[in-house]
């Protein structure tokens, strides 16, 4: 669905969130895959403080530990811009302040799976997807955990944190930071139902 009229020239986030929430997953995914770099930048800036995110936005509270939840993504890079981030709760059900995940994408053979931990960010309402943290466990069907400094992952994941902001119930937008500095890399995620 084409919703650029709700983004350009200035994002109307309340209306955009309402429409995204009313769409089914296929239409929501089609919509976010149409958003270009300029629109992702606008949305990220506009989403500052708009919808407070919690870990439940990435893995709903009714999911058991080690059950995968898929978020489809589109980034602002010129190539390899469709991917998935797959999330789960830790095996220890009492550990409620962290999620685990990895990047499922076509060039994982070269970069590795890009494992990360997910925590609430220092800024209220934001979530950090942190590639600097070591993930100690994973669902059995996920790829082997390898350090993010192995393979070409050292150029992609090592030292990186994705700072996430909320747009709607299923859609969030992020910007990558490396070594504390913002990168010119944005992406949008859409959670599967």
What are these regions (language model features)?
Residues 1-193:
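Soluble ligand-binding/transfer domains with enclosed cavities or grooves
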């Amino acid at each position: 669905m084409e919703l650029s009229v709700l983004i350009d020239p200035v994002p109307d986030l309340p209306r955009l969130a309402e429409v995204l929430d009313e769409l089914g997953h296929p239409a929501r995914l089609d919509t976010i895959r149409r958003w270009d770099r300029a629109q992702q930048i606008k949305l990220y800036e506009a989403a500052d403080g708009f919808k407070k995110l919690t870990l439940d936005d990435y893995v709903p509270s009714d999911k058991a530990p080690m059950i995968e939840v898929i978020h489809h993504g589109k980034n602002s890079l010129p190539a390899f811009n469709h991917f998935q981030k797959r999330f789960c709760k830790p095996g220890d059900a009492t550990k409620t302040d962290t999620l685990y995940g990895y990047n499922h994408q076509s060039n994982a053979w070269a970069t590795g799976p890009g494992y990360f931990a997910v925590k609430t960010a220092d800024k209220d309402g934001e979530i950090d997807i942190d590639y600097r943290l070591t993930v100690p466990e994973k669902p059995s069907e996920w790829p082997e955990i390898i350090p993010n400094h192995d393979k070409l992952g050292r150029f992609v994941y090592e030292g990186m944190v994705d700072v996430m902001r909320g747009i709607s119930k299923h859609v969030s937008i992020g910007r990558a930071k490396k070594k504390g500095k913002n990168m010119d890399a944005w992406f949008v995620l859409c959670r599967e139902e």
